[in-house]
A protein has these predicted regions:
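A broadly conserved sequence feature marking short terminus-proximal activation segments
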Residues: 1-10, 23-56
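Conserved Radical SAM active-site core
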Residues: 39-172
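Local cysteine-cluster metal-coordination motifs and their immediate loop/turn environment
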Residues: 15-37, 80-92
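Short Cys/His-rich Zn2+-coordinating modules
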Residues: 1-8, 16, 67-70
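Residue-identity detector for glutamine
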Residues: 7, 11-14, 90, 96
Length: 173
C-alpha cells in the first residue's frame, strides 16, 4: 500500500479523500466508494498500488483514439476499482470487484511496466484503461512520469469523474 494523495484529516482516524467528487469521508479500517482507497489510522492508502488486473498491447484505435498515432499499438494496463457503478459496465468484474487478497497478488513496479512497454518495437507508450484509472492515481502518475521521461506517450481511458482534470477522452465502459 502507498499513502494516497488528495486527502485531508477530518478528525482522529477519519479522513476525506478529495480525489473525485464523491469526497468520501473514510473511517479507520474502511474504504471509499471505489473500494481501493482505505483509511488506516487516519491516513488514506492506495491498496492497489502496483497491482495489475489486466494488461496487453492494443491498437490505439481500441481506446478509442483515432487521430492519436493511428495504426500504432499501446501497452494497456488496468487494476481494480471504480468511482462509479454503471449498470452497463463491460469490465464490471474488475471495476466492481473488491478482492480481499490484494497482498497475495503479483505487484509490478513502474519500472517493470515501462520496460515491458518498451520491449515492443511498434508500441508508442502506455494506456491506463480497463477499470477507472483515476482511482489508481498515484501508481498511474508514477508510471506516466517514468514513461514520459523515456519518450513514451501516455493515454487515460476514463469516466472523467475526478477533481483534478479539466478535459479527457471520456468513455463509460
Amino acid at each position: 500500500m502507498k499513502i494516497a494523495r488528495y486527502q485531508e484529516t477530518i478528525q482522529r482516524y477519519q479522513s476525506r479523500c478529495n480525489l473525485c467528487p464523491h469526497n468520501c469521508v473514510i473511517a479507520d479500517g474502511k474504504s471509499g466508494r471505489c473500494h481501493v482507497r482505505e483509511n488506516s489510522e487516519g491516513d488514506i492508502y492506495l491498496k492497489t498500488y502496483g497491482i495489475v488486473s489486466s494488461m496487453g498491447f492494443d491498437p490505439i484505435e481500441k481506446k478509442p483514439l483515432y487521430h492519436f498515432h493511428p495504426g500504432k499499438y499501446i501497452f494497456s494496463i488496468g487494476s481494480f476499482g471504480c468511482n462509479l457503478k454503471c449498470r452497463f459496465c463491460q469490465n464490471w468484474e474488475i471495476s466492481q470487484s473488491v478482492p480481499d487478497h490484494y497482498s497475495k497478488m503479483k505487484h509490478f513496479s513502474p519500472e517493470e511496466l515501462v520496460s515491458m512497454a518498451a520491449e515492443r518495437r511498434d508500441n508508442i507508450g502506455i494506456a491506463f484503461t480497463y477499470n477507472e484509472p483515476a482511482v489508481w492515481f498515484e501508481f498511474m502518475m508514477d508510471i506516466a512520469a517514468l514513461a514520459k521521461s523515456r519518450g513514451m506517450k501516455t493515454a487515460m481511458v476514463t469516466n472523467g469523474f475526478i477533481n483534478l482534470f479539466n478535459g479527457a477522452n471520456v468513455t463509460l465502459k
